[in-house]
């Protein structure tokens, strides 16, 4: 049976993040291992959401304990989602170095809203996009990762950028198209 490691928000009463992934993938009989980046009582869009355990929550510690307990492998699909801060991002980066199949869902913002995470974390996503095997980004997120403005990002340019990403993920040996500083966080 296939293992899936999901590293994203755990929202107790809404179907987003780890809850959504478990709902969709659990019915497919995958072994699903959940690592929270943040724990919320409800989606942050609700004004009365409470954040739990934020200070001691370290995805790398949870990952290391899971690896000791369950038969996880470096080629297991690893989903990276909502990342609340740079400390969590750096912990996730260490997990990415150990895992080979990364699905990046860079939960960062939306058209008409802009970024709803801090710029440091958004720029972190720019550095790890080169390490991802797959990406699930909305138009705003994809534009941000490519340093493009959503108002003048043409369909032709979008298709070219998607093609370049595909070439990179199948072993393209050129420089990372997304940012000149792709190794900035990988070296820290």
Predicted regions located by residue number:
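A generic structural signal for short hydrophobic patches within well-formed alpha-helices
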Residues: 109, 142-143
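Conserved phosphate-donor
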Residues: 134-136, 141-142, 155-188
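Active-site glycine- and acidic-residue-rich loops that bind
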Residues: 82-89, 112-121, 145-155
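Short secondary-structure transition/capping segments
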Residues: 44-48, 148-149, 179
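Charged helix-capping and loop-helix junction motifs
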Residues: 93-94, 117-126, 150-156, 182-188
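Short, acidic/small-residue loops that bind anionic groups at enzyme active sites
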Residues: 97-116, 123-132
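Conserved N-terminal subdomain of the carbohydrate kinase-like
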Residues: 1-109
């Amino acid at each position: 049976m296939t293992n899936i490691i999901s590293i994203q928000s755990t929202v107790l009463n809404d179907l987003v993040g780890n809850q959504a992934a478990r709902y969709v993938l659990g019915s497919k009989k995958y072994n699903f291992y959940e690592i929270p980046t943040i724990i919320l009582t409800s989606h942050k869009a609700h004004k009365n959401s409470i954040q739990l355990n934020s200070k001691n929550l370290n995805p790398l510690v949870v990952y290391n304990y899971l690896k000791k307990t369950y038969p996880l492998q470096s080629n297991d699909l690893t989903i990276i989602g909502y990342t609340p801060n740079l400390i969590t991002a750096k912990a996730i980066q260490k997990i990415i170095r150990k895992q080979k199949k990364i699905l990046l869902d860079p939960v960062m913002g939306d058209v008409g809203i802009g970024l709803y995470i801090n710029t440091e974390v958004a720029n972190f996503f720019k550095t790890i996009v080169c390490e991802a095997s797959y990406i699930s980004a909305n138009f705003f997120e994809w534009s941000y990762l490519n340093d493009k403005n959503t108002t003048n990002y043409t369909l032709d340019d979008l298709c070219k950028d998607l093609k370049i990403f595909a070439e990179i993920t199948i072993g393209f040996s050129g420089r990372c198209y997304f940012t000149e500083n792709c190794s900035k966080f990988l070296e820290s």
